[in-house]
Amino acid sequence: MIKRYTCQNGVRIVLENNPTVRSVAIGVWIGTGSRHETPEINGISHFLEHMFFKGTSTKSAREIAESFDRIGGQVNAFTSKEYTCYYAKVLDEHANYALDVLADMFFHSTFDENELKKEKNVVYEEIKMYEDAPDDIVHDLLSKATYGNHSLGYPILGTEETLASFNGDSLRQYMHDYYTPDRVVISVAGNISDSFIKDVEKWFGSYEAKGKATGLEKPEFHTEKLTRKKETEQAHLCLGFKGLEVGHERIYDLIVLNNVLGGSMSSRLFQDVREDKGLAYSVYSYHSSYEDSGMLTIYGGTGANQLQQLSETIQETLATLKRDGITSKELENSKEQMKGSLMLSLESTNSKMSRNGKNELLLGKHKTLDEIINELNAVNLERVNGLARQLFTEDYALALISPSGNMPS
C-alpha cells in the first residue's frame, strides 16, 4: 500500500513498504527538465544533475562515490524533458545513510569552479559521444522536426556553446527558480517502515523557495521532414506521429497499440521489417507522453542502399494496420504481455520507486494494480483500431541521418 504525505512547505513524499525484500530505493524527483529551459541555458538541467555529484560542503566528489560503494549501494541520476531524478538503492539497514547523502547533495552542493571546469569537459565528451551515435541523435532530430523551436524540441544535453556559459551562479539561480518544494517528490520503496516519512521530512520538509512562475506554453505538433548528412554505416530513420499526453483517458489503448506495432519481437514492424525481409537489425516503436503533448515514434536503421525499401515496408505495415486493424489474438497477447511486464516490475524496488515518483509528480494520483489490470482488460478491438486510424495519418514528422542525406520518396 502506498503512503502519501505532503510536508508543510509542499514537498510530497510517497512510500511503499515491501517487507519481503532487503533493499530500499530512494528517489528525489524534481519537476524540471530541458522543457523548462530557454535557448540561452539549454542543457543546464542536465549539467546541474552532473554537478550534484561533484562535492558538497562536507564531502568531495570521491567521498560521495565512496559513500555508496562501501555499503554496496547504487547511486545515479538522469534528466528528461520534464523532470530530473536523483536516486539510490541500498540495503534496508543503510536507508537513512543513503537519505542523508542524497539530501546533502541536494542542499549543500558547492559547485566548485575547478569541478565545474572538469565536469564541463566531461559533458563535452558526452555530447561528442552522442554525436557518434546516430541511432540516438536521430531521435533528437525528430524532436526538432516535431516541436520546432518549442523547448520540447531542445536537446537534453544542450550544446557546447550553452554549456560554456554555465557557472556556479547560474546553477544556483536555476535551482532557486525550479528546485522549489512544490516541484519536489521523494519516492521510497522497499523494506522500510512508514516512520521513514518523518526522516525524509526532517531533511526536505522545511526549506523554502518561491521560485519562478512557469505557465508552460502548449506546443504545436509540426510535421517537418529533417535530414542530416553524416558519414555513417547505416541510414537511421524516425517517423513521429501525434500521440497522447500524460494521463489521457485512452493511454492504455495506445500502450496496447504500440506494443502490437513495434514494442516486442512478435510485433508487426519486427516481423515485417526484420524477420520477413531482413532489412534491419533494429526496428521498433515507442510512445512519449508529456504534460500536454505526446508522440509515437517509429525507428529503423538499415544500409543506405535499403533505405527506400525500409521506408516502403514501414508504410505498408502502417497501411495494413489502419485498413485491417489488429487481430483479437494480437489484442489478447499484447494485454497479457503488458500485465506480465507490470507484475515483473513490481519485484524491483527501483521500478516501484520510479513508478510511484512519476505518478505523484506528473499525475498527483496512484492506481492500484487491480485498477491498472481492469483498465487493460477494458481495452478492446474497436478502441485500438479506431485509435490507429486516428493517429497514423499522412501528417507525420520525419528525421533521417544518412551518408547521402537524401529523403526516401
Curated annotation (Swiss-Prot):
<comment type="similarity">
    <text>Belongs to the peptidase M16 family.</text>
</comment>
<dbReference type="Pfam" id="PF00675">
    <property type="entry name" value="Peptidase_M16"/>
</dbReference>
<keyword id="KW-0645">Protease</keyword>
<dbReference type="GO" id="GO:0004222">
    <property type="term" value="F:metalloendopeptidase activity"/>
</dbReference>
<dbReference type="InterPro" id="IPR050361">
    <property type="entry name" value="MPP/UQCRC_Complex"/>
</dbReference>
<keyword id="KW-0378">Hydrolase</keyword>
<keyword id="KW-0482">Metalloprotease</keyword>
<dbReference type="InterPro" id="IPR011765">
    <property type="entry name" value="Pept_M16_N"/>
</dbReference>
<dbReference type="GO" id="GO:0046872">
    <property type="term" value="F:metal ion binding"/>
</dbReference>
<keyword id="KW-0479">Metal-binding</keyword>
<dbReference type="InterPro" id="IPR011249">
    <property type="entry name" value="Metalloenz_LuxS/M16"/>
</dbReference>
<dbReference type="Pfam" id="PF05193">
    <property type="entry name" value="Peptidase_M16_C"/>
</dbReference>
<feature type="binding site">
    <location>
        <position position="50"/>
    </location>
    <ligand>
        <name>Zn(2+)</name>
    </ligand>
</feature>
<dbReference type="GO" id="GO:0006508">
    <property type="term" value="P:proteolysis"/>
</dbReference>
<keyword id="KW-0862">Zinc</keyword>
<protein>
    <recommendedName>
        <fullName>Uncharacterized zinc protease YmxG</fullName>
        <ecNumber>3.4.24.-</ecNumber>
    </recommendedName>
</protein>
<dbReference type="InterPro" id="IPR007863">
    <property type="entry name" value="Peptidase_M16_C"/>
</dbReference>
<feature type="binding site">
    <location>
        <position position="126"/>
    </location>
    <ligand>
        <name>Zn(2+)</name>
    </ligand>
</feature>
<dbReference type="InterPro" id="IPR001431">
    <property type="entry name" value="Pept_M16_Zn_BS"/>
</dbReference>
<feature type="binding site">
    <location>
        <position position="46"/>
    </location>
    <ligand>
        <name>Zn(2+)</name>
    </ligand>
</feature>
<feature type="active site" description="Proton acceptor">
    <location>
        <position position="49"/>
    </location>
</feature>
